[in-house]
Amino acid sequence: MFKKLFRQDENILNSELAEDLPIPRHVAIIMDGNGRWAKKRFLPRIAGHKEGMDVVKRVTRYANAIGIDVLTLYAFSTENWKRPTDEVDFLMKLPVEFFDSFVPELIEENVRVNVMGYRENLPDHTMRAVEKAIADTAHCTGLTLNFALNYGGRSEIITAAKEAMKELELEGKSADDLTEEKLNDHLMSSGLGDPDLLIRTSGELRLSNFMLWQLAYSEFYFTDTHWPDFSKEDFLQAIIEYQNRSRRFGGL
């Protein structure tokens, strides 16, 4: 059944994209608006998060169908611990439910799970679910489904700089030998490449401490659609918009 869904998505999506224009290799998404979606419907915030989890599954299918290599999703920031305890507790249970229900299907479609963030600070049940999903899909070589979980861009840069400096010291080198490449090697996203396209839902025009180093030359796409309402058409529109932009990377 899962393969059939992927094949259907592939046929529909690819038929609407320009064949002679590139698709982004790495797409990152700030999944915003779960709470506002729920409030609009007089539902508790956790209802929005639950609905948002189902959208993650659909968007993963879309990304895999059109040949995207890496899909990075901002799931939980280092600042999100400040939210009400009951909401945080629910959010920490979502990965358990998500991976338990979705990993068998991801394996069938050759999708690898990766999680970047300060995993050591996650609750034990969340950590176990994350580590199991990573281990169970480690052999997969297709799309990398990368979750930013307990992640913060500023902290990541500081951590990477410290680790890079320690490595330089062991090599008998100084701070003058620190390069972008050396720092990049110690980022949590090392090996995944920088995002080509950032999508943010729910109309907010900010990065919220997400991949601050990696987004330096990414194309940004903002939509007013709340994440639980993010559809195949919304995803397609973002990709089409990317295809029609000219990336200069600081040049002419």
Curated annotation (Swiss-Prot):
What Pfam families is this protein classified in? Answer: Prenyltransf
Write the Enzyme Commission number(s) for this entry. 2.5.1.-
InterPro entries assigned to the protein according to its UniProt record, in alphabetical order: UPP_synth-like, UPP_synth-like_CS, UPP_synth-like_sf
Q: What cofactor does this one take?
A: Mg(2+)
Active site (UniProt): 32, 80 (proton acceptor)
Residues given in the record as substrate binding sites: 33-37, 45, 49, 77-79, 81, 83, 200, 206-208
At the top level, the lineage of the source is Bacteria
A single Gene Ontology biological process assigned to it is: polyprenol biosynthetic process
Q: Keywords assigned by UniProt?
A: Magnesium, Metal-binding, Transferase
**Similarity comment text for this entry:** Belongs to the UPP synthase family.
Question: Could you tell me which NCBIfam families the record lists for this protein?
Answer: PRK14830.1, uppS
Q: What does this protein do?
A: Catalyzes the condensation of isopentenyl diphosphate (IPP) with allylic pyrophosphates generating different type of terpenoids.
Q: How does it assemble?
A: Homodimer.
Query: What is the recorded name of this protein?
Result: Isoprenyl transferase
